[in-house]
Regions:
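Cytosolic, membrane-interface loops and tails of multi-pass inner-membrane proteins
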Residues: 169-186, 252-255
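Helix-loop-helix junctions that connect adjacent transmembrane segments
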Residues: 14-147
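C-terminal membrane-solvent junction of multi-pass transporters and transport-like membrane proteins
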Residues: 185-188, 231-286
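Helix-loop-helix module between adjacent transmembrane segments
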Residues: 3-7, 22, 153-156
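Single conserved hydrophobic/aromatic residue that forms the stacking wall/gate
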Residues: 1-10, 290
C-alpha cells in the first residue's frame, strides 16, 4: 500500500480514528464505569505512585517516553500544503502533542486499574485490559471487534511511517546526495527501492524473535532500538535546524521559528538537542527482561 504513494495513505487516515482515538476513548470510559460501579483498582495511588528513578531499569523505560511524540515531525514534510502554516502548523503540533499525552497517560492508567501488576507485560496488556473490561460489563463479544480495530489502526500508522520518512530520503537522493539506485520510482512516483530496503531491514530485525528468550524481551529491545534510531535523527534535526539558520539565512521557508532573530530557535533547538542526548545516553543502560 505504501508503494501507491502518500495520497493513497491519506485515504486511510480513518484508520487513526478507528484504531487509535476511538479505542483509547472507549478504554478511558470503561475505566470510569469500572471505578464508578465499585470495581477495585489494581493500581495503588499511594506513595509508590511515582517511579523509582534510582532503579536503572526505570531510567531506561523513561527514555521510551520519547516514542510518545515519535512521528509528529512528519507533519513538517507536508507544511507546504497547509493554509497559513506560520499559524496553523504550531497549532496542529500542540493539539497533536496534547492528544498524544492524554491517550498514553490516561490509557496507561486505565490498563493499570484493571490488570494486576504481576500480569502486566509490554505485548499483551492492551488486549487483556479490553478483554477484562468487556467481561466486567458483560460484553465479551466486543473483544474480537476491538482487536480488529486496533490492528487496522496499527496498519494505518505503519503506512504513514513507511511512506513519510522514505519520502524525505528520496528528496535527499534527488538532490544528488545518494546513488541513483535510491532515486528510482515506480509508476506512481513512489521511491520503490527505498521502500524495499526498509522492508528488508525490518524483516532481518524480525528474525530476532528466534534468538530472544521471550517475545517481551524482543519487544523491549526493538523498542529501545527504535528510540535510539529516532534520537539520532532528532539530534541531527535539532542541530541541523540551528546550523541552517546561519548557513542558509535567505532560503525561503514556509514556516519559521521566531518572527525575528535566532533566540527562539536556540531555545527550542537547544532544549530538544539536550533532551534527546540525555535519553540517548539512558537508552544504553542495561535493563532486565522481566
Amino acid at each position: 500500500y505504501a508503494s501507491r504513494g502518500l495520497g493513497d495513505v491519506y485515504k486511510r487516515q480513518v484508520g487513526g480514528m478507528v484504531g487509535t482515538i476511538i479505542p483509547a476513548g472507549l478504554l478511558m470510559v470503561l475505566a470510569v464505569i469500572y471505578l464508578a460501579s465499585g470495581g477495585q483498582s489494581q493500581m495503588n495511588f499511594d506513595g509508590n505512585f511515582f517511579p523509582d528513578f534510582s532503579n536503572f531499569d526505570n531510567l531506561v523505560l523513561a527514555s521510551s517516553i520519547f516514542l510518545f511524540y515519535a512521528g509528529m515531525e512528519m507533519g513538517g514534510i507536508h507544511v507546504k500544503d497547509m493554509e497559513n502554516p506560520a499559524k496553523n502548523y504550531p497549532k496542529a503540533v500542540f493539539i497533536g502533542a496534547a492528544i498524544t499525552v492524554i491517550i498514553f497517560v490516561l490509557g496507561t492508567f486505565a490498563l493499570g486499574i484493571i490488570i494486576p501488576e504481576k500480569d502486566i507485560n509490554l505485548t499483551q496488556s492492551l488486549l487483556v485490559g479490553f478483554d477484562n473490561y468487556f467481561k466486567y460489563v458483560h460484553a465479551s463479544w466486543l473483544s474480537p471487534i476491538i482487536a480488529v480495530a486496533l490492528a487496522f489502526g496499527v496498519l494505518a500508522g505503519v503506512l504513514t511511517w513507511v511512506a513519510g520518512p522514505s519520502k524525505g530520503i528520496f528528496a535527499v537522493g534527488k538532490a544528488g546526495y545518494l546513488p541513483p539506485f535510491f532515486q528510482k520510482t515506480n509508476a506512481n512516483g513512489v521511491q520503490k527501492n527505498i521502500l524495499l530496503i526498509q522492508g528488508l531491514a525490518v524483516t532481518l530485525l524480525s528474525l530476532l524473535f528466534v534468538v530472544m528468550p521471550s517475545v517481551q524481551s524482543f519487544y523491549q529491545i526493538l523498542s529501545q532500538l527504535t528510540v535510539l534510531l529516532y534520537l539520532i535523527m532528532y539530534l541531527l534535526m535539532f542541530s541541523g535546524a540551528i546550523y541552517l539558520r546561519y548557513n542558509m539565512k535567505k532560503a525561503p521557508r514556509p514556516f519559521r521559528i521566531g518572527s525575528k532573530g535566532n533566540g527562539l530557535m536556540w531555545l527550542i533547538g537547544g532544549l530538544g538537542f539536550c533532551g534527546s542526548l540525555l535519553a540517548f545516553v539512558l537508552s544504553f543502560i542495561p535493563f532486565s527482561y522481566t
